[in-house]
């Protein structure tokens, strides 16, 4: 029987489906870094979100076979230590593939249009008091024709690139740092 320990249940508000295979499930609302090894003792599967799992912790857990990260990033886990031990590491792929790129574009539009400054001018009554049909207090820039540099070409970076290109932006993707070659469509880091 697999022993599954979820170290940070409060970090995910969605219902978590339990696996169909025989297992013992233990969950904690939150876990501090100093509690990781104690709470994962005897676990075969660890579910984590933000609490780090460094090499020392990985190596102190001989029964551990899998680390499931309830997030997109894997930077909280020592991947080399897991690989050396044959521990499978999985993360949530495809999460917010549309939501995050759309939010990025919304923020770029807000910045390029100076949305906050314009809102404050309207709230202060400047627009209503203007002798002109509009105000020229804050610069407005178009995204069309602008250049966007992206670091990362995973699903989120590619989603942002697609939307930016649809806006008529020039997209530069950064090649991996210290890469010996630069792929077509990329620029050196």
Name every feature range the model reports, one short phrase each.
Residues 52-64, 81:
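Rossmann-fold NAD(P) dinucleotide-binding segment
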Residues 134-189:
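Rossmann-like dinucleotide/phosphate-binding beta-alpha-beta segment
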Residues 93-147:
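Phosphate-binding beta-alpha-beta segment of Rossmann-like dinucleotide-binding domains, i.e.
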Residues 1-43, 172:
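N-terminal glycine-/charge-rich "phosphate-binding" loop or analogous flexible N-terminal tail
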Residues 75-85:
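Rossmann-fold NAD(P)-binding glycine/threonine-rich loop
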Residues 29, 70-71, 87-98, 175:
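Short beta->alpha connector loops at strand-helix junctions that form conserved
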Residues 40-45, 62-64:
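Short acidic/histidine-rich motifs immediately flanking catalytic phosphotransfer sites
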């Amino acid at each position: 029987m697999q022993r599954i320990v979820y170290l940070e249940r409060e970090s995910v508000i969605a219902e978590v489906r339990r696996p169909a295979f025989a297992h013992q499930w233990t969950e904690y609302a939150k876990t501090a870094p100093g509690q990781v090894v104690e709470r994962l003792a005897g676990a075969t599967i660890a579910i984590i979100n933000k609490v780090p799992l460094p090499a020392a912790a990985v190596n102190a857990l001989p029964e551990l076979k899998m680390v499931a990260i309830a997030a997109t990033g894997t930077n909280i886990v020592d991947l080399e230590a897991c690989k050396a031990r044959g521990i499978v590491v999985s993360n949530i792929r495809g999460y917010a593939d549309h939501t995050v790129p759309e939010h990025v574009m919304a923020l770029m539009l807000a910045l390029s249009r100076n949305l906050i400054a314009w809102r404050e001018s309207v709230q202060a009554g400047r627009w209503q008091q203007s002798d002109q049909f509009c105000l020229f207090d804050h610069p407005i820039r178009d995204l069309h024709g602008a250049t966007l540099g992206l670091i990362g070409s995973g699903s989120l970076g590619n989603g942002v690139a697609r939307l930016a290109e649809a806006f008529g932006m020039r997209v530069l993707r950064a090649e991996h740092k210290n890469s010996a070659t630069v792929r077509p469509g990329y620029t050196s880091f």
